[in-house]
Amino acid sequence: MENEYRLRFFEEEGLKRKRCKVCGSYFWTKGEHEVCGDSPCQEYEFFDVPTKVKLSLRDAKREFIKFFEEKGHVPVEPRPVVARWRDDLFLTIASIVVFQPHVTKGLVPPPANPLVIVQPCIRLEDIDNVGLTLGRHMTGFHMGGHHAFNYPDNWVYWKEETVKLAYEFFTERIGIPEELLNFKESWWEGGGNAGPSFEVTVAGLELATLVFMQYDVVEENGQKKYVPMKLKVVDTGYGIERIAWFTQKTPTAFHAVYGELLHEFHKRLGVEEPPDELLYELVRSAGLMDPERPETLERVYKRASEKLGMRVDEIREIHSRASLVYQVLDHTRTLMWMLADGIVPSNVGEGYLARLVIRRTLRALKKLKADVPLSELLELQINYWKDDYPRAWKNKDYILDVVEFEQKKFEETLKKGRNIVIRLIKKKKQITLDDLVELYDSHGIPPDIVSEIAKEMGVRVEVPHNFYSIVASRHQKTVHKVKGAEEKGKLPPEIIEWAKGFPPTRRLFHEDPYMKEFDAQVIGSNRNYVILDKTAFYPEGGGQAADTGVIASGDESYRVVDVQKVGDVIVHVLDRDYSGGKVVVGRIDWERRYRLMRHHTGTHLLLGALRKVLGDHVWQAGAEKTPEKARFDFTHHKPLTREEVRKIEEVANKVIDERRKIRAFTLPRNEAEARYWFSIYQGGVPMSKDIRLVEIEGWDVEACFGTHLSNTGEVGSLKIISTRKIQDGVVRVEFVAGTRVAEEAAKMEDLIREASEKLSTNPEMLVKRIDALQKELENVKKTVAEYRKRLVSEYLKAAKALDGIKYVKLDLRDPELVQEVLRALSSDSPAAVIVDGRVELAAPKGVDVGKAVREVVREVGCKGGGKGNRATVVCESEEKVVELLSKLAAKLTSQPSGRRG
């Protein structure tokens, strides 16, 4: 392995290979020191290291880009923090994620080669350490990356050049003395790839990692195997926040990153800023702090106490409160990024991670007893960073609204949560880590709240320091794919395998979506499955139903009942086995197809209207287009109001009236993303070099496989027929378009007319008639309640007792009356209410009527059961009822806790 790290550059520059006397890792340096320069092997001593420049975060980003641009790299715009192009990640955790898997797998060329990018990233694995380690850990950070993609026929650069670039950047541009720079040997694995790497460290602080991605990691017979990649990738990650901190030498990284905003947060949260000398003393040992081992913190406090003459408990309190301020500062910027890029907090996916950050921030505010709305702090962040993150400024209204909504929701959760925790403790007598995770996942109850409630009940709960990291790690990854016929199971496995052997089918439905009839050659048939050289039949996909119609060969006609896509091959499913010739005529069921086209184009129109009315956070979560109607699921934090529905319809129909042009065209993926951004990927991200786009002029552009109209006027009109929240953070809209609007209107007219006739009024007076009936009903309810009250009193007077069980027979089948009588009768002893052989039983708490019933019911010849102090039994005769009550009385008397009146 040593050869992987022995470079000509090191020899030429005089760097020697050493072994760290603390951790045993090998590193390369010009210096005489014996440690690798990383923490915890070395404390943070970079405060004493001189530099040429003093860089703000903005300056550090600019200098990084400028340096590598001068070295021949093309700057690339940063991508969203939501990794919607990945099917295994929710968040962008590194700059290389931007190019995985489409570029790193060789499917798509990079946007430039070599390139440089400063990418906002979010990692939640160490969320519990944020604040406590004074800037060593952050949930949100900028990763500077210079990347080179080395193809067999286009080699760019590799280890020698990468290390030289890093060396020059840190020594020449930043001005770090050469003898203090270390290149620590390491090994990197992630995302199915691996390779050797160097960690660039200086005086305790890691400033960059240089990864040489050269292996695919595969598993064979349970053994990990490294297979050389054809495409070798230079994957570097420079900590831009750390570079800013390194050059500014501020007491914490938060001071370097947030500047005046840090002071404002201290003021708003009512927390006095710690003295700089204390922070400097604590931060030097930040690399030694392991919050999962409290004794490491205590050692740091004790040392600071001895040096500064302060009490340990005083230092602990100051550090704890300042840490919470830094945590809130970090989390609110991370939230700003998440929400600005369209995440809607929910209980699944990336929405779950956003909610986790929100709720952890709210708990920090609670611990500080800070009476400050979270939205107020988000607004400070948005205003402070508006020039750096214009998407946050643009989506400010949504960000503040959703945060206020989430804060209210969390407060309601805490009110309900107490009883949930109490019930669980009574049932289990203890709370495990799995219980804590379940309580948080399913009910949103934070672990510290659980611990407080448990303590009141005399139960001790161990809450791991890294609880939120554990929870986040369970929700960091996903698998969401646009399914083809292979995954949908619409075709038998043997047909899928058979279809893979044919060349791609020419797509006439894309060349001319209005083609109703076509000639084609049969190039394969297998039972009732047929493959043509070209087809106008649209295969199911993108939420659009498959076409149906007829395939004719000579005098024979076959119904096309389904069409599926296997890769680039289109399979036609017929109503019977095919026995025709090689030449066929295909005829589309045009009326059905045209309705599908109207609904598909209508869906694109609707999405544009939703984003216009509700905001850019609206993102497709699912869609289905059928001839009858279309369904569109989208991300949004609240159910739609009637006013919003009307506005959405109005906006969509205005675009229909404007008869805007619609065109479908193909662009190279990189060009499509650069021109239209990532909102084109509403229905998933195709892993292809070229992207087919559908554009509604001046309104909407999406990557889409479906068939569309030529202008919006052909949609006719659009009417939303239903909206509902289908899950946390997802709203479903169903709508109809074209002639279906008139059909739906006729259906509603019939319903209104029928209702009017039944209520003996005309449609215009229907609402008034219903209002009048509601008032009548309320009066009737009041009258019934009064009579019921009198009846309860009468029945209580008529009650009898049988061996300690009170009972009464009712001659009215009124469930509410039965329950009211039973409640009153069983307040101090077991009781029964009998209605037509049905016996409802109840008793005071502590009396197990259910158990007694289960023991005697068969013996008596009745049927029934119960649980706790309630039961229901059905008997065929009055004699059996009497026998039942008598035997129950005996059983209840023998119960240890049985009570009788």
UniProtKB/Swiss-Prot annotation:
<dbReference type="InterPro" id="IPR022429">
    <property type="entry name" value="Ala-tRNA_lgiase_arc"/>
</dbReference>
<feature type="binding site">
    <location>
        <position position="708"/>
    </location>
    <ligand>
        <name>Zn(2+)</name>
    </ligand>
</feature>
<comment type="similarity">
    <text>Belongs to the class-II aminoacyl-tRNA synthetase family.</text>
</comment>
<keyword id="KW-0820">tRNA-binding</keyword>
<dbReference type="InterPro" id="IPR002318">
    <property type="entry name" value="Ala-tRNA-lgiase_IIc"/>
</dbReference>
<dbReference type="GO" id="GO:0002161">
    <property type="term" value="F:aminoacyl-tRNA deacylase activity"/>
</dbReference>
<dbReference type="InterPro" id="IPR012947">
    <property type="entry name" value="tRNA_SAD"/>
</dbReference>
<keyword id="KW-0479">Metal-binding</keyword>
<dbReference type="GO" id="GO:0004813">
    <property type="term" value="F:alanine-tRNA ligase activity"/>
</dbReference>
<feature type="binding site">
    <location>
        <position position="604"/>
    </location>
    <ligand>
        <name>Zn(2+)</name>
    </ligand>
</feature>
<dbReference type="GO" id="GO:0005737">
    <property type="term" value="C:cytoplasm"/>
</dbReference>
<dbReference type="Pfam" id="PF07973">
    <property type="entry name" value="tRNA_SAD"/>
</dbReference>
<keyword id="KW-0067">ATP-binding</keyword>
<keyword id="KW-0547">Nucleotide-binding</keyword>
<dbReference type="InterPro" id="IPR009000">
    <property type="entry name" value="Transl_B-barrel_sf"/>
</dbReference>
<dbReference type="GO" id="GO:0006419">
    <property type="term" value="P:alanyl-tRNA aminoacylation"/>
</dbReference>
<protein>
    <recommendedName>
        <fullName>Alanine--tRNA ligase</fullName>
        <ecNumber>6.1.1.7</ecNumber>
    </recommendedName>
</protein>
<feature type="binding site">
    <location>
        <position position="600"/>
    </location>
    <ligand>
        <name>Zn(2+)</name>
    </ligand>
</feature>
<feature type="binding site">
    <location>
        <position position="704"/>
    </location>
    <ligand>
        <name>Zn(2+)</name>
    </ligand>
</feature>
<dbReference type="InterPro" id="IPR018163">
    <property type="entry name" value="Thr/Ala-tRNA-synth_IIc_edit"/>
</dbReference>
<keyword id="KW-0030">Aminoacyl-tRNA synthetase</keyword>
<keyword id="KW-0694">RNA-binding</keyword>
<dbReference type="InterPro" id="IPR018162">
    <property type="entry name" value="Ala-tRNA-ligase_IIc_anticod-bd"/>
</dbReference>
<keyword id="KW-0963">Cytoplasm</keyword>
<dbReference type="GO" id="GO:0005524">
    <property type="term" value="F:ATP binding"/>
</dbReference>
<dbReference type="InterPro" id="IPR018164">
    <property type="entry name" value="Ala-tRNA-synth_IIc_N"/>
</dbReference>
<dbReference type="InterPro" id="IPR045864">
    <property type="entry name" value="aa-tRNA-synth_II/BPL/LPL"/>
</dbReference>
<keyword id="KW-0436">Ligase</keyword>
<keyword id="KW-0862">Zinc</keyword>
<dbReference type="GO" id="GO:0000049">
    <property type="term" value="F:tRNA binding"/>
</dbReference>
<dbReference type="GO" id="GO:0008270">
    <property type="term" value="F:zinc ion binding"/>
</dbReference>
<comment type="function">
    <text>Catalyzes the attachment of alanine to tRNA(Ala) in a two-step reaction: alanine is first activated by ATP to form Ala-AMP and then transferred to the acceptor end of tRNA(Ala). Also edits incorrectly charged Ser-tRNA(Ala) and Gly-tRNA(Ala) via its editing domain.</text>
</comment>
<keyword id="KW-0648">Protein biosynthesis</keyword>
<dbReference type="InterPro" id="IPR018165">
    <property type="entry name" value="Ala-tRNA-synth_IIc_core"/>
</dbReference>
<dbReference type="InterPro" id="IPR050058">
    <property type="entry name" value="Ala-tRNA_ligase"/>
</dbReference>
<dbReference type="Pfam" id="PF01411">
    <property type="entry name" value="tRNA-synt_2c"/>
</dbReference>
